[in-house]
Amino acid sequence: MVGAENMTASFSNNRCHDTIDEFRNQVYSTMYSMISVVGFFGNSFVLYVLIKTYHEKSAFQVYMINLAIADLLCVCTLPLRVVYYVHKGKWFFGDFLCRLTTYALYVNLYCSIFFMTAMSFFRCVAIVFPVQNINLVTQKKARFVCVGIWIFVILTSSPFLLSKSYQDEKNNTKCFEPPQDKQTKKYVLVLHYVSLIFGFIIPFVTIIVCYTMIILTLLKNTMKKNLPSRRKAIGMIIVVTAAFLVSFMPYHIQRAIHLHFLHSETRSCDSVLRMQKSVVITLSLAASNCCFDPLLYFFSGGNFRRRLSTFRKHSLSSMTYIPKKKASLPEKGEEMCKE
């Protein structure tokens, strides 16, 4: 949420002289650096492979491409956060980029949740109701769903654009800091409950229901021959659920506890410091979903592994035959036949 990185700081200055500034700066700069590198190269590679094998059209490919784009848009702003925390909370990039960097993190967070939920729902439909709803799981419908998710998240996340930069008492420009006035704090609390219900609880329940139905359906078909497909589906369920629990659940639970903690009358210095550290850890975990998503692509029922194999063969083939310019036309024709 707005200023989640340092939310407790302004509430503890009058009572607690200790701070977690050093801990915060070290953890955020380290975690965001790692997420930037791993997330950028992982999602760039996945996106490149998916685009290169776009002739293998499927609804799940559409969701995976959009998920990779959301991750890349986020990781491109994380280096700005790294610079901010390396310089001990000094912002050098202007008010617009301050707002945009905050906004990008939460757009990615909730786009990832909704794309994963949509993938889970349509996979459930494909496995549990393969005949009755065969026209529901199509690439065209997947595009409409993705456009709807982007529009919904972009609009509903717009309040995060209100998180502007400002000058502190030492004339340093600050960003990602907590709201100061009571009215804004109440607004943040309302925003939290809306995002908690619609951005986490409903999607999480949907995923659990879908995966329960998938598992029950697969268990009923244990005597059938498609054992490899069943193993791939269960593997995907485990990875998606684990990523959801590790990245999103700790952040939303901690945020709920944190906001109520801020409104309590009695807060010891130790409890304030512990709460501040929990903010740092859970927000870092939430941002790390950019690194987990490439694993989701890999475990999406073997589809991505097949694409990767196809991509590798095409790449090796092109490298082998590039010098033979006279043979380029028949080779291209052969590839078209294979596709």
Swiss-Prot record:
This is Cysteinyl leukotriene receptor 1. One of its GO terms (biological process) is positive regulation of angiogenesis. The gene is Cysltr1. Signal peptide: none annotated. Coiled coil: none annotated. Receptor for cysteinyl leukotrienes mediating constriction of the microvascular smooth muscle during an inflammatory response. This response is mediated via a G-protein that activates a phosphatidylinositol-calcium second messenger system. The keyword Disulfide bond applies. The chain crosses the membrane at residues 31-51, 60-80, 109-129, 144-164, 196-216, 233-253, 279-299. It is a multi-pass membrane protein. Disulfide bonds join 98-175. It comes from Rattus norvegicus (Rat). Belongs to the G-protein coupled receptor 1 family. It is found in: Cell membrane. GO terms for molecular function: cysteinyl leukotriene receptor activity; G protein-coupled peptide receptor activity; leukotriene receptor activity. InterPro entries: CLT1_recept, Cyst_leuk_rcpt, GPCR_Rhodpsn, GPCR_Rhodpsn_7TM.
